[in-house]
Amino acid sequence: VFADHLHLIHSAWRGDTLSHPDNHLYPPAPQLAARIWIATFSVEGAIRAGQAGHGLMLSRTQPRPPGEPRLPLDAIQNPIIDAYLSALPDGVAPRILASRTAFVADSHAHALQIAEPGLRKQAAQHREAGHRIEGDSVTDYLQQLDAHVGDPEHVIASLAQDSVLARATDISFQVHSVEPSHRDTLRSIELIAQHIAPHIR
């Protein structure tokens, strides 16, 4: 189903007929075919993305294998990257986007305080969905929900443990599932730009 719909999008961009001789995308945009990104949790999805020369999008978190709730995210995603790179046609430059949860505050204690309600809510949702979450502290949740939270020093140290970031061509940050105020979100963006970004490039 996914492949069929992706093919339809390609056809539309080329300006092909869409279900009726008079239906065409105007203006056609065939150049968009070189800008497709595919999000996947699996090696199989990464292989398909690589074979097609698409970009690979990696999630900020993803389910752990049964019995391994504390398996690091990069241990799951590095094999996905390996499969993608192996499948890329010769001469096609890799495009790998790693999305990550990061909330940065001037005070480490303040960051944890702001993060706790949202992380507890996400942990409860994971458990209700049948996923195993160990422990009940903010520290437990940070590791298992892949959230990088704290003052700049702590977040830099946390991100440094994620080997996927060194392999990514693009990195994006979001505050979800932390639920900060608008002001705290803007301050986090500012701190990421000033203190975090220089350390991950």
Protein language model features and the residues they cover:
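Active-site-adjacent structural elements that line small-molecule/cofactor binding pockets in enzymes
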Residues: 1-201
